From Swiss-Prot:
Homotetramer. NCBIfam families: PEPCase_arch. Coiled coil: none annotated. InterPro entries: PEP_COase_arc-type, Pyrv/PenolPyrv_kinase-like_dom. It comes from Pyrobaculum arsenaticum (strain DSM 13514 / JCM 11321 / PZ6). This is Phosphoenolpyruvate carboxylase. GO terms for molecular function: magnesium ion binding; phosphoenolpyruvate carboxylase activity.
């Protein structure tokens, strides 16, 4: 049986350390040799990664005796051709197959077995990419005599309203395939930007439950990948203080992303704790999550979007100061859309968005505070904490970075007051340390945001 990776090293710009594309080749090898990651994701989604990078990683791995295609894989994330230029998607596929051409020629191994297709909302695009891969592979074999192997498409579903349909989408994507084992990627971050922390967290546990159902009904083994970062808003699976709890809350995953912040902004001991928590809890099970959560996901999303829409100008103002620590396309060119009725607003991508909220003294998990107070008053909050057993600890963690005085300079009194009232209800003391408070009192600038981020151990 083919080895399925457990730890996926990514190129997310969530660290305070600037990493250039030139450094990413060495970074990929270090991910295996120092951090124990058995997969590295070369990212082309909204990112100016050289198309020769997968091949360069292949050649470096061969020279370093890294067990390519056995214990170490390169996985390419291409742009979704519906959202970015079609040529960029095709060039990314070419980069993956060129890497396999060289790994097959020089190491008789297949370095790239999977490509990730982001922002999947239907199965047509997945099938298009799969068809293009197979046709390109046939041409390589017929024209060069080199079998670059079969490359599978991993659908990355990263919108709460689409994740709740994961069972249907996966069923359509793999219904005509002979595979007995498939990988499905669930992303927390972009879903949180669009729908808020509560809705996106509930959508993921519901999707995991439905994928388990699909597995039982189809006989196809599903290997879920969880895409999560360090802050609670982005899943906290990489957070040294929360990872051991999050692995229980999101039980059922097989692979987890190891993003940049946990590798560069924490100590090696802290990283090892995160890694061991993820590995030890892999493949655990949790009770089935029923359809009763769907109305709550809808309500939480609507309430969150209503609050976020009121503050779009301030978010954009602060987001412009958040530094880019990878060679990504600016969020102004490739951001995220937030829908509220007929209104569409252009938002930063998840890491910049999250960082901006922290810089305003208001962690983005607290945007749900008005709804949580409503749930508390109607005796429904305990049911939420039962579904998400780590949720209260996430809120307690984020209240360490909440400063009402700073937040009032940017946000409505209504939202800030709701966060204060929620802290009182939960019995949580909302008090940042004197050092963090002093940083919040300073004028916002790029160095100031970096300093705040270094204290938290993540940019966003």
């Amino acid at each position: 049986m083919m080895h399925i990776p457990r730890l996926m090293c990514t190129q997310h710009p969530d660290t305070t350390v600037k990493i250039t594309t030139a450094e990413e080749v060495d970074e990929a090898i270090v991910a295996y040799t120092a951090y124990g990651c058995d997969e590295v994701m070369v990212d082309y989604e909204g990112k100016m990664t050289p198309y020769g990078q997968p091949k360069e990683i292949v050649m470096k791995a061969i020279r370093g005796d890294v067990p390519l295609g056995d214990e170490f894989y390169i996985t390419v994330r291409l742009p979704n051709p519906k959202l970015e230029e079609f040529d960029r998607a095709m060039l990314s596929l070419e980069a993956a197959l060129v890497a396999n051409y060289f790994s097959r020629r020089y190491a008789d191994a297949q370095a790239v077995r999977w490509v990730v297709l982001p922002m999947v909302e239907d199965f047509d695009t997945v099938i298009l990419v799969r068809r293009m891969l197979r046709r390109k592979a046939e041409i390589y074999k017929s024209e060069t005599g080199v079998d670059v192997g079969e490359v599978e498409v991993i659908p990355l579903i990263e919108d709460a309203f689409v994740q709740v349909k994961a069972k249907v989408i996966v069923g359509e994507v793999f219904k005509s395939e002979e595979a007995r084992e498939v990988r499905v990627f669930l992303g927390k971050s972009d879903s949180a930007v669009r729908h808020g922390h509560l809705a996106s967290a509930l959508a993921i546990i519901y999707a995991m439950s439905k994928l388990k159902e699909f597995e039982a009904e189809s006989g196809i083994r599903v290997r879920p990948i969880l895409g999560m970062g360090s802050p609670p808003f982005r899943g906290a699976l990489n957070n040294p203080r929360l990872a051991h709890l999050e692995v229980v809350q999101y039980a059922g995953y097989y692979t987890a992303t190891i993003q940049s912040a946990v590798r560069y902004d924490t100590s090696l001991d802290e990283y090892v704790k995160v890694r061991e928590s993820i590995l030890n809890a892999c493949c655990g099970t949790r009770g089935l999550v029923g359809e009763e959560v769907l109305p709550l996901i809808q309500e939480a999303s609507a309430k969150y979007r209503s609050q976020a829409m009121k503050h779009v100008d301030k978010i954009a103002e602060v987001a412009r100061l958040v530094p880019s620590t990878r060679d990504r396309v600016s969020w102004k060119e490739y951001g995220r859309s937030l829908l509220d009725g007929d209104r569409v607003v252009h938002m930063p991508r998840a890491i910049v968005y999250t960082s901006a909220w922290y810089a305003m003294g208001f962690p983005p998990t607290l945007i749900d505070a008005p709804l949580l107070l409503e749930l508390a008053k109607s005796d429904k909050l305990d049911a939420v904490f039962k579904l998400l057993p780590t949720y209260k600890m996430e809120l307690e963690y984020d209240y360490e970075f909440f400063d009402p005085q700073t937040a009032r300079n940017y946000l409505s009194e209504e939202l800030v007051y709701a966060a204060v009232e929620l802290a009182d209800y939960l019995g949580v003391e909302a008090r940042p340390t004197p050092t963090y408070t002093a940083l919040l009192k300073m004028p916002r600038s790029e160095p100031n945001i970096i300093a705040l981020s270094k204290y938290r151990k993540f940019l966003g």
